[in-house]
Amino acid sequence: MKAIILAAGLGTRFKSEKHKVLHEMLGKPIIWYVLNYIKQSNIVDIALVVSHKKESIIEALKHENVSFFEQANPKGGTADALLSAKAFFEGMDDYILVTNGDAPLVKPDTIKGMQRFLHMVEEYEKIKVGALVLSSFLPDPTGYGRIVKNGKGDVIKIVEEKEATYEQKQINEVNGGVYMFYVPYLKEAVKHLKPSEKTNELYITDIIEIMTNLGYTCRSFMASEITEIFGVNDRWELSFAESVIKMRILENLARSGVTIHSPESVYIEPDVQVELDAEIFPNVVLKGNTVIHKKAKVMNGSYLENATIKEKATVLPMSYIKNSTVEEEAIVGPMCHIRDNSVVGKGSHVGSFVELKNAKLQENVMAKHLSYLGDVNIGKKTNIGAGTVVANFDGKQKYQSYIGQKAFIGSNSLIIAPRNIGDFAFIAGGSVITKDIPPKALAIERAELKILEDKSKVKDE
């Protein structure tokens, strides 16, 4: 089976300079979700029909294995878009999936179910289905095309809302906009397409009635969820679709053994991995290729992007971690900033208002308060006092520093990179370190304290 995605529409209701299918939900463009459910259905030969702003779509999908076809007239209608890719299904004796580029909520299992249905009909009824239409029942079907059936339950046509009779408007089964056509029958049916008298467009839905008139059987297949048939036509529908996908992700994680508190407030992107017995608290954001390992906790309001949180580690509230790793049983936060390939070693603690930039902390390092540690490797069991700064930038270049194991860096110390601080070294609080400190040495660098009696400028009133 092959697949064709129709993405040639103008998308005027988005009111955007960007093509509709490139607007993002959970960090991925709409078209990514469409491609994803097709590929997860084991369909690898995929074509995309484009027109309006085609260059941006082609550029966005340059790493995808898809073929592109251009619809010369983007107002030609959905069937005209399909015919623009006629060369893609020329010579096929199989079914072809046709779906819309703005329909990201279809599930892979639904497409697989449609494929199985076609095989069952062929096996037991010994016929080819001309068209299988994804459908759903809506309590209020206003605005949707109605699925009209005969007494045997076969679909005989799809009637759009504006053309439906009163009786047809009472039908609650609606068109989901996803089709599987048997290509030999499709090629015969499109020969009989005629433009709409009202819009002069060629509609893909007209193919169903044409196939019926040619004697071909058409059927419908019920979507497992109503939301699967919802398209994305404006920014509000984009927000709704994003919330549907997000809740699917969260439900899947929860049913796989992850505790998620107040899931409506949690944001998790599709590529994020969360393992058994991990715990996610309210207002957490997990983006990119973030991985949360077993029994780890990410607490309220934390933002993680391409972060790895190892087993039993804890991210305390309001922490920001990007492109970095927190090792087993480490604690970070609250309100810390960890970035640029930093590593917090096993059992280490990085506390409030501590920033790590390309910093590598080995096991059991303590840096609990108000510090900036940039471009530095710190040995195990070293203590970093409050207010410590490793100054890594001289205005032109950044430099690397090394602090050994079991060193003690006193509060308010300033280490001017590049520096080597040896194992077991002790730096007294308030020191400015401009030289390397050998192992086991005590380093004190302070200006002499002067007390000038009666020189205070504070007036005694």
UniProtKB/Swiss-Prot annotation:
Q: Where is this region: N-acetyltransferase?
A: 257-461
Q: Where is this region: Linker?
A: 236-256
Q: Which biological process annotations from GO are given for this protein?
A: cell morphogenesis; cell wall organization; lipid A biosynthetic process; peptidoglycan biosynthetic process; regulation of cell shape; UDP-N-acetylglucosamine biosynthetic process
Q: Where does UDP-N-acetyl-alpha-D-glucosamine bind?
A: 6-9, 20, 71, 77-78, 145, 160, 175, 233, 339, 357, 372, 383
- Residues that hold acetyl-CoA according to the record: 386, 411, 429, 446
Q: What is its EC number?
A: 2.7.7.23, 2.3.1.157
Cite the Pfam families for this sequence: NTP_transferase (PF00483)
Q: Which Gene3D superfamilies match?
A: Hexapeptide repeat proteins, Spore Coat Polysaccharide Biosynthesis Protein SpsA, Chain A
Name the cofactor(s) required for activity, per the record. Mg(2+)
Per its UniProt record, what PANTHER family does this chain match?
Answer: BIFUNCTIONAL PROTEIN GLMU (PTHR43584:SF3), NUCLEOTIDYL TRANSFERASE (PTHR43584)
Descriptive protein name? Bifunctional protein GlmU
Question: What species is given as this protein's source?
Answer: Hydrogenobaculum sp. (strain Y04AAS1)
